Amino acid sequence: MCGIAGILNLMDREPPRHEEVDAMVTQLQHRGPDGYGYFLDRHIGLAHSRLSIIDLAGGNQPIHNENKSVYVIFNGEIFNYIELRAMLQGAGHRFYTASDTEVIVHLYEQYGLDFVHHLNGQFSIALWDANDKKLVLARDRVGIRPLYYTVNNGRMIFASEIKSLLANRDVPRRMNIQALGEIFTYWSTLTPNTLFENIWSLPPGHMMVVHKGQLNTHRYWDWTFDTDKPADDLPLQEWARQLKSLLIDAVRLRLRADVPVGAYLSGGLDSSVITSFIKHYTDTPLRTFSVSFEDSEFDESEYQRELIKFLGTEHTNVLCRKADIRDNFPRAIWHTESTILRTAPIPLMVLSEKVRKGVSV
């Protein structure tokens, strides 16, 4: 994962300073340890912390178009970027990188705000149209990638994490009491609320356009269930075939990377199915990772071992003890930027720290 951060002036005031956006993006180094990139002009400051996955040498952000009138910083991955790139090149667009980020730039040139409808991926995007002095923020359909923002002192400030916003001195630190009540009721805040007052999350499947000092947010995608249409009367085997086809296609697209790919194994059905597909559609040895527990009530190592033996993966297991959960709880709160009411996220965080030493996808 990468990290993005930015400052946009909503009124006439001093331009964003490099040290301001640098302070924000420094808070995101754990998301993108492979380098920082910046763009600043009179109106906006953009910063990006990069985790290199596609186009390791040439994919540094911000990415711009041919005449440098459109700039993009982006956290995530566009799975259908190869097909989109070919289509855009056929329409006359010229690329200077092999990255999936540049596809977003040229899609915007081609389709305007409808560019987002062409994306198959997980993403949070910030796009600056320098000619129109317009900022576009967009988040993927189900909100896999985070994006937060606040408005204060004539500025709109946004970032991948709240701690990045708080690194800016214009952003006050006040608890949102209503959001705290939501956490103890629903185990989570209700979007767009966060645990911090006047800091909001851009909802999944939404786009925000900031133009002439106005923030306009709209939903560009939603779940659709046609209740008036009768269900197809198909045998169970056909439904299973269609589901398998969709899963295979989803896994195949997500294997596009210029770095090694690994898989988590929980011992459950979902991770077992996905890992089996990955193993089938990759030529290189597959590394798998799992977490085990001292308490047999929570441990599923037996099921993990069965699949590891069946697939022949290169496996790494991490034993998470009760003391590990206790010791890592404060750091988990720092990462989640919210109240944690259960211990489940901590073992996954401990495992992820082990994984990131050799695998980033």
Can you name each region flagged by the protein language model?
Residues 1-337, 348, 352:
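Cysteine-centered catalytic environments shared across enzyme families
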